From Swiss-Prot:
Keyword Amino-acid biosynthesis appears in the UniProt entry: no
Biased composition (Basic and acidic residues): 34-49
Record GO terms (molecular function): GTPase activity; tubulin binding
Protein localization: Cytoplasm
Name of the featured protein: Tubulin-specific chaperone C
InterPro entries: C-CAP_CF_C-like (IPR017901), CAP/MinC_C (IPR016098), CARP_motif (IPR006599), TBCC (IPR027684), TBCC_N (IPR031925), TBCC_N_sf (IPR038397), Tubulin-bd_cofactor_C_dom (IPR012945)
Chief location bin: cytoplasm
Keywords of the record: Acetylation, Chaperone, Cytoplasm, Phosphoprotein
Summary of the function given for this chain in its UniProt record: Tubulin-folding protein; involved in the final step of the tubulin folding pathway.
Positions carrying Phosphoserine: 79
Disulfide bonds: none
Region (Disordered): 34-55, 148-173
Subunit relationships: Supercomplex made of cofactors A to E. Cofactors A and D function by capturing and stabilizing tubulin in a quasi-native conformation. Cofactor E binds to the cofactor D-tubulin complex; interaction with cofactor C then causes the release of tubulin polypeptides that are committed to the native state.
Length: 341
């Protein structure tokens, strides 16, 4: 009621002479100004929310339409032409999602990324179905010294455990990771193009390791790394960092998300805006790593080499628009001279 009385008093004074307005206590004038500012702020907030809802509605309709088209292509009889069209439309879906990151709610973003991962998995499966199967043939039996027949021994499996199956991470492709390294210390590790092409890579629980990934993976996840240097060729979709410390990462990708990571330098080429959350001491610089065959890997990845938003970063823990986030910064030029080899 006091705010209403204040407004009525100011209105009465304004209807009279300037002298009447000067008689209104300064405290009431200031309170009325604050009330008007708050009213304007709420009005602007409602307008912004309406715009965001309109954008989200457009995204949801466009995404659902294109997703249905890709699913229809993948359900039909498999052919190289249909799968190529499905791959192209799936790439368009990825671009739509990446271009909408700024206004999408976190839940909607995760749902979109999960849908993309599922479609990519089905596309990969259908492509494998088109590949010619190897013919089965019996091996000749060997005879021992006594002349008795012996059946070939069963193939020996590797004693090294396969990479662990992880629960589905935000935006990460679902069930399992195709290749990677885990639980190693002070090692120089490398995978080549034929091992990486369009596969999902997991690097986890590494300490003081140097990892070179010379090829075109589909996704890359780096988790629980300490003091590592990770150099990666162009990644077709997303790169995820989680719980890393004192690392150096060089990567080109469509989207980068960094969680719970500290004191890490990222040499980046990215076509969307990078995202950091619950991080500190993250430094960004342009992607400068190179290796023989990188041009072909960029071509296979579908990334636009002329587009690089390496210094466009959104911090989900820093909402002040006009104040720079203290959790990330640009790596000074004099500190970018890295000896990759």
């Amino acid at each position: 009621m006091e705010g209403v009385d204040c407004s009525m008093a100011l209105a009465d004074a304004a209807a009279g002479s300037p002298r009447d307005l000067s008689l209104v206590p300064e405290r009431l004038q200031r309170r009325e100004q604050e009330r008007q500012i708050e009213v304007e702020r709420r009005k602007q907030k409602r307008q912004d929310q309406e715009v965001e809802e309109e954008k989200s509605g457009f995204f949801a309709a466009a995404f659902a339409r294109e997703r249905a088209a890709v699913e229809e292509l993948l359900r039909g009889e498999a052919s190289a032409e249909r799968l190529e069209e499905a791959a192209n439309r799936l790439q368009g879906l990825r671009k739509l999602l990446n271009d909408s990151v700024l206004f999408l709610a976190a839940y909607d973003l995760r749902q979109g990324q999960a849908a993309l991962a599922q479609l990519q998995a089905v596309l990969t499966e259908r492509r494998q179905e088109l590949q010619p199967k190897k013919r089965f043939a019996f091996k000749a039996r060997k005879k021992d010294a006594a002349g008795t027949a012996q059946v070939d021994a069963a193939p020996v499996t590797s004693a090294a455990p396969s990479p662990p199956v992880t629960k589905e991470e935000e935006g990460a492709p679902g069930a399992s990771w195709a290749c990677g390294f885990s639980n190693l210390e002070s090692q120089d590790l490398e995978k080549r193009a034929e091992e990486l092409h369009q596969r999902d890579v997991l690097l986890s629980d590494l300490t003081n390791c140097t990892v070179k990934l010379c090829g075109n993976p589909n996704t890359l996840r780096l988790a629980k790394a300490r003091g590592c240097k990770v150099l990666c060729g162009p990644v077709t979709t997303s790169v995820f960092l989680e719980d890393c410390r004192d690392c150096v990462l060089a990567v080109a990708c469509q989207q980068l998300r960094v969680h719970t990571t500290k004191d890490t330098r990222v040499f980046l080429q990215v076509t969307s805006r990078a995202i950091v959350e619950d991080c500190s001491g993250i430094q960004f610089a342009p992607y400068t790593w190179s290796y023989p065959g990188i041009d072909k890997d960029f071509q296979d990845s579908g990334l636009d080499r002329s587009k690089n938003n390496w210094d466009q970063v959104d911090d989900f823990n820093w909402l002040a628009r006009n104040v720079a986030s203290p959790n990330w910064s640009i790596l000074p030029e004099e500190e970018r001279d890295i000896q990759w080899d």
